Amino acid sequence: MSKTALGKANASVQSARALYLRLLKYAARYWVAFLISIIALVTFSATNTGFLATIKLVTDAGFVNQDSTKLHLLPFMLFGLLAIRALAGFISNFAMRWVARRVVENLRQDTFRRLMSLPVSFFDAVSAGVVTSKLTYDTEQMAGAATKVAMSAVRDTLTILGMVGYMLYLDWQLTLIFAVVAPAMAWYLKSMTPKLRSSGKAVQQTMGEMTKVIEEAVSGQRMVKIFGGGDYEYQRFTKVAGKNRHMQIRLARFSGLNSMVVELLAGVALALVVFYAVGKFSAGEFAAFIGALLMLIGPVKTLTSLNEELQVGLAAAHSVFELIDSIPEVDEGHEEIGRAEGSIVFENVTLQYPSAQRPALLDLNFTVKPGEKIALVGRSGGGKTTLVNLLPRFYEVQQGRVLIDGVDVRNMSLKSLRQQFSLVSQDVILFNDTVFNNIAYGVLRNASEEDVIAAAKAAHAWDFIQQLPNGLQSEIGDRGVRLSGGQRQRLAIARAILKNAPILLLDEATSALDTESERHVQAALDELMQNRTSIVIAHRLSTIENADRIMVMEQGRIIEGGSHEELLALDGHYAKLYRKQFH
């Protein structure tokens, strides 16, 4: 083996060891239950040796020498050993399963906590299905590696040590015959470990892909049905399910080979022992020795199969710990500004997405006064949404500065900064909960019913809420599926109204409403915007004619700015957009 290959192998071993030690730390939190399980396992393993010693004693003293006293004791001795074995087995299994469920819970909590602290860019790059697979399937595999593998390793290792020790006691020379096959077995298992690890990792990846396809197909059912995508989605799922089956079978093949090789090597050892033992032992010693050798095969096979589960668990651990170790949002600011007056300044701001060929925003400079209503218009991809995303720091400025009330947003804590904003986006986000909990969401959860009703009325949502079966306590389904598009939009606006933040971010806030609803909601928004800074993204220019200033964006730059009348008089890009919509 070359030095490079050897270095990689050593690094892989160290990485696996570090992963497993980190995983065991989760189990170590519950060391009392873990210790109880280990003690029970020691007791369980000791009964195996006790059982063989009893067989030897009874065979020699009972069946050979016809000692009736010991023959009468045999049933009680066997029952006692089996009773102790059964009790120890129950305690060890229950205690380890209890620890396993705690480990799964802690892993999921840590993973979800980190998930909630990651930047928006992470969620833009990773699908919900892959994340879901990490939180569900991968954490279960990790728990198995941390508890079941540890439990079986302790139990079977102790059993092997007990059996080998007893065999050495009976005849150390004969025991060495078994030791001859041990190096071959160890070499084979070591050579299989990388294959098991890579197969386990492939299984994790295909599980993530499968969850992703399911999540997309289920959440997009209306689109799937209207465009006849059922067969296409079925083909996608069949393809990824086939990949998963292939990887699972590959893993099973390696595991089966392990078991077969262990059986063959054990058969060689058994044949050699029988060949050399004939005529050298008493009947009891021979029965005990062969019994010990046979009882070795099971634990050795279990340990080899554990290698599969261990490698799958380590592959899962790498996946989950990679997420847990992801860098959270930068939150190094310490300034707390209370309620902002609402001034906004962009100074030489530039941002380019990692995979983009040109900047999304390029050298932006503008100022918004407190209480001013700014409208952003322009063709899709012009940078309007990116600009808005910089204000609450969904993305970080790469060049330049963004200031709120004269304070760089990077110098504020994220909590203080985001308290200044209410957001209504084009993609309305509602949760599978009640109307009340969707309006009084997050930091608003302690709002009174009177305040929620007032916000609903201001958003022209109260009339339809009253008509729901349970009013504010009505469940609205996944992503608000039981409501119309306009109703969902109005709930989102009610949520923004209830927050009563000094700065409003409205991204196509009325795009899903019919003409009558739009008129009512626009009136409510106009009233809400009084004395508040508002930034509105709109394609429907009729909704922003009364804006204090309209900024036209093109390829990340502001190419025009002014009031509605001023821009029409300029007869530039805005005037062309306006004529397209109204003529």
Swiss-Prot record:
Q: How does it sit in the membrane?
A: Multi-pass membrane protein
Transmembrane region positions?
Answer: 32-52, 71-91, 115-135, 160-180, 259-279, 286-306
Uppermost EC category: translocase
Domain ABC transmembrane type-1 as annotated: residue spans: 34-312
Q: Which reaction does it catalyse?
A: ATP + H2O + lipid A-core oligosaccharideSide 1 = ADP + phosphate + lipid A-core oligosaccharideSide 2
Q: What is its EC number?
A: 7.5.2.6
Q: Does the keyword Electron transport apply?
A: no
Key words, A-Z: ATP-binding, Cell inner membrane, Cell membrane, Lipid transport, Membrane, Nucleotide-binding, Translocase, Transmembrane, Transmembrane helix, Transport
Q: Where does ATP bind?
A: G378, R379, S380, G381, G382, G383, K384, T385
Per the database record, which ranges form the ABC transporter domain? 344-580
Q: What is known of its domains?
A: In MsbA the ATP-binding domain (NBD) and the transmembrane domain (TMD) are fused.
**Name of the protein this chain belongs to:** ATP-dependent lipid A-core flippase
Q: Which organism is it from?
A: Methylobacillus flagellatus (strain ATCC 51484 / DSM 6875 / VKM B-1610 / KT)
As recorded in Swiss-Prot or TrEMBL, the protein's gene is named msbA
